Amino acid sequence: AGCNTGFFSVGAARMGISVVAIDTDPFVVASLWRMASQERLDILPLVVNLAQPSPPTGWRNQEYPSFLHRCHGAFDAVLMLALVHHLIATEGIPLFEIFRLAAEITRNLLVIEYIDPADQMFRCLARGRDYLFRNISRQAFEAAARAYFDIVRFQQVGPTRFVYAMARKINRF
């Protein structure tokens, strides 16, 4: 889960925005890298699993910082589209922790998609473990978000999907 083929990453880069694009699938990351190279787009595609990010490495784990340490406060905006349901259903990451991570890596803006557990893709990922997601709702999503973000706007983009624009609250970290 992540940038996938880079549709939004490429669009941002074509507008002159410097992009770091991550996904767990090395094939889509390689494809995005080739496209970005051919078009000379400012995109750094990386293979990263947000649920198990790269740890610090090197002598005494101090030569190279962890992925999350390198990303702390590094981005003006973070897009998490079609990602949250993967982190919840596949990795078991609580909503609150997802928003905490987003607040740690963005300085300003979060664009994030809420996908209801009734969504066909969510149900496919859950594979009969629906009881684990009983408490997931738009209200719970928004409540978890408000600990770190102000909801600026949201738009329904499908029967079970909503995209939110959120502004990071100041002085949370």
Where are these regions (language model features)?
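A conserved beta-strand element that flanks and buttresses the S-adenosyl-L-methionine
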Residues: 79
